[in-house]
């Protein structure tokens, strides 16, 4: 081991190894597919509690609601949704 070395493999050696690409050829597409399914199925909306695009506005509304009282905004929006 050379002086000042941390004992880790050089990055270039890692990314040129067959073992690295065998592992990552499976994991990287799997992460992408899992993320795509998480968003496309709507599970992301449920997990984070955000409204779905079709529920932002009611059908009778033509513009976004305006909150007039800063500290009573939740009550105003809840009243709007009833």
UniProtKB/Swiss-Prot annotation:
Pfam families attached to this UniProt entry: Cytochrom_B559, Cytochrom_B559a
Protein name per UniProt: Cytochrome b559 subunit alpha
Signal peptide (UniProt feature, chain positions): none
Cofactor (UniProt): heme b
One of the GO BP terms on file: photosynthetic electron transport chain
NCBIfam families: cyt_b559_alpha
Subunit structure: Heterodimer of an alpha subunit and a beta subunit. PSII is composed of 1 copy each of membrane proteins PsbA, PsbB, PsbC, PsbD, PsbE, PsbF, PsbH, PsbI, PsbJ, PsbK, PsbL, PsbM, PsbT, PsbX, PsbY, Psb30/Ycf12, peripheral proteins PsbO, CyanoQ (PsbQ), PsbU, PsbV and a large number of cofactors. It forms dimeric complexes.
A single GO molecular function term of this UniProt record: electron transfer activity
Organism field: Prochlorococcus marinus (strain SARG / CCMP1375 / SS120)
Keyword entries, A-Z: Electron transport, Heme, Iron, Membrane, Metal-binding, Photosynthesis, Photosystem II, Thylakoid, Transmembrane, Transmembrane helix, Transport
Main location: membrane
Annotated family: Belongs to the PsbE/PsbF family.
Co-factor binding comment: With its partner (PsbF) binds heme. PSII binds additional chlorophylls, carotenoids and specific lipids.
């Amino acid at each position: 081991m050379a002086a000042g070395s941390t004992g880790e493999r050089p990055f270039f050696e890692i990314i040129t190894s067959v073992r690295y690409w065998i592992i990552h050829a499976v994991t990287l597409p799997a992460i992408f597919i899992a993320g795509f399914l998480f968003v496309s199925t709507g599970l992301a909306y449920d997990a984070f509690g955000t409204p779905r695009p079709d529920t932002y506005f009611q059908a009778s509304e033509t513009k976004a609601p305006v909150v007039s009282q800063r500290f009573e905004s939740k009550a105003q929006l809840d009243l709007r949704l009833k």
